[in-house]
A protein has these predicted regions:
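Short, well-ordered alpha-helical scaffold segments within catalytic/effector domains
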Residues: 81-89, 106-107, 162, 194
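Conserved H-X4-D acyltransferase segment
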Residues: 95-110
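Conserved phosphate- and dinucleotide-binding cores of soluble alpha/beta proteins
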Residues: 5-12, 19-25, 30-32, 44-45, ...
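Short, well-structured alpha-helical patches and their helix-loop capping segments
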Residues: 2, 76, 80, 101, ...
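HTH-adjacent hinge/linker in prokaryotic transcriptional regulators
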Residues: 2-5, 9, 15-23, 28, ...
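Distinct, well-ordered alpha-helical segments
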Residues: 113-114, 221
Length: 255
């Protein structure tokens, strides 16, 4: 069982039980105690669970329909997101004002920024999760777009956000997407996010697309831009040779 599936199973079990012991989980999932402890650390840092003596319980604030929640989506292909985030750090160099979108992949990138020794930057975001993560972090000057909070999707949206972004000068944007279509369109399923990203493509001097290899040839409801409009695409090493050959004709590819 891959780590992402195992963590989902842990959350499902917690939905059915008020408390789960670490040794009990290790036995049921047929993995070592060390592996379970590592899973618990990731889920705890995501805000999904609380660690208590001898085990864990579901975080009451995330006890709703967690299958659709942002922090559960973050667990999908989590190792790929971390790989992509670490590669993306080098592209912060000489950039003063950065936009970070509200995707789970970019949230992982934000975590890497906050835990690194990069110089202080102006970070602009429409992500409530990134705002919370940035509390008491010394190397960022964080600017929120404000707007209407859509908790289920971890997004500040609405016309206010677009109007706010129109007045900014952005050196670089780091974004993700629901999928890349067969025509190499960058797509999303969220109307608010589509409008925001369309504005970002107009305003940012440089677009960095952070997207894992499972998203290629997956098509969302709304097209935002073509992949050639990105300065670079940063993905994981499991990208197919076919997709790789196509992308390098359109933009810089970082693997």
């Amino acid at each position: 069982m891959i780590p992402e599936e195992r963590r989902k199973n842990i959350l499902i079990k917690l939905k059915e039980n008020d408390f789960l012991g670490i040794e009990e989980l290790a036995s049921e999932l047929n993995v070592s105690k060390i592996t379970i402890v590592r899973d618990i650390q990731i889920l705890k840092s995501s805000g999904l669970i609380e660690k208590i003596h001898g085990g864990i319980k579901l975080n009451e604030k995330s006890a709703g329909d967690f299958e659709s929640r942002f922090f559960v989506r973050m667990q999908n292909n989590y190792s790929k997101k971390v790989e992509i985030a670490k590669k993306s750090l080098e592209f912060l160099k000489n950039k003063d004002t950065i936009f970070l979108d509200s995707s789970s992949t970019v949230f992982v990138f934000a975590q890497e920024i906050f835990s690194s020794s990069v110089e202080e930057r102006n970070l602009i975001t429409n992500s409530p999760a990134i705002l919370v993560e940035a509390l008491n972090k010394p190397n960022v000057n964080l600017i929120s777009t404000g707007g209407e909070l859509k908790q289920e999707f971890n997004i500040f949206g609405g016309n206010w956000v677009n109007e706010f972004l129109e007045n900014l000068n952005i050196d670089a944007a780091f974004i993700s997407a629901a999928g890349i279509s067969s025509n190499l369109d960058i797509t999303t399923n969220n109307k608010d996010l589509a409008g925001i990203l369309e504005t970002i493509f107009k305003k940012a001097k440089e677009i960095n697309l952070l997207i894992d290899s499972t998203k290629f040839y997956k098509e969302g409801m709304l097209s935002i831009a073509h992949i050639s409009d990105c300065r670079r695409v940063i993905t994981d090493k499991e990208i197919s040779e076919e997709v790789k050959a196509i992308l390098i004709k359109e933009t810089e590819l970082i693997i």
